[in-house]
Amino acid sequence: MLARDWYYNERRQTGLGSAVASVYDRHDDSDIRARAALTMLGVQRGWRVADIGCGNGVLACEAALMGAEVDAIDISPAMLALAEIQARDRKVAIRTQAAGLLSFAYEPNSYDLIVSEFALHHLPDFWKAVALSRIHGALKPGSSFYLRDIVFVSMPDGPERDVEQWADFNIKNHGFSRDSVVTHMRDEYSTFGWVIERMLTDAGFTLLSADYHAPLHGTYLLRKPKPGEQG
């Protein structure tokens, strides 16, 4: 998509400097979870896989270890630097791309799998829909999209309870500060799970599963239908 003067500036939330990125790296023990997710998704040698919002590159490197050709994409230079270190340490090849959901470069119908974890909430809802349409266009027909993000599963009458539970969960389990939770709620763009589901199906995906777990976390497995299939 060509840049326009009205186009959303993803780099207003490049997110993390090197100091904060190191905190994410230190607390992220996701190797086993990443491997399990990729196994569930059926990753095969020779697949083209994109990890958009790749963070420290754990999942991208695990996919490369399974024989996939991997594009590790992130808007944050600090995170891409961590991903490159991960790849060197594990002796795998990944391609890094400094871009986000609205700006990553792709050839239509080229990926066997796209993964995006905890990146979509950086975009307002209109731009979430644009991003999901781009992901749909980048996937081969019959291929999968695996999405995880911070979403609201309660109605608006329960925000205080849910946000406080989420804050406690992240502080106790991931070592984040309360300030980081406050920043997310005040300045970022998480939305309701049912809104995400509608956006995904409107973008053309078949929703295979939606799992709402832990405070304010949602996991979605999608498929891009083949021509002639019901969406």
Q: What are these regions, as identified by a protein language model?
A:
Residues 129-141:
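A short glycine-rich, Lys/Arg-flanked "PGG" loop and its adjoining helix->strand segment in the class I
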Residues 148-203, 210:
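C-terminal alpha-helical "lid/dimerization" subdomain adjacent to the S-adenosyl-L-methionine
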Residues 203-231:
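Core SAM-dependent methyltransferase catalytic element
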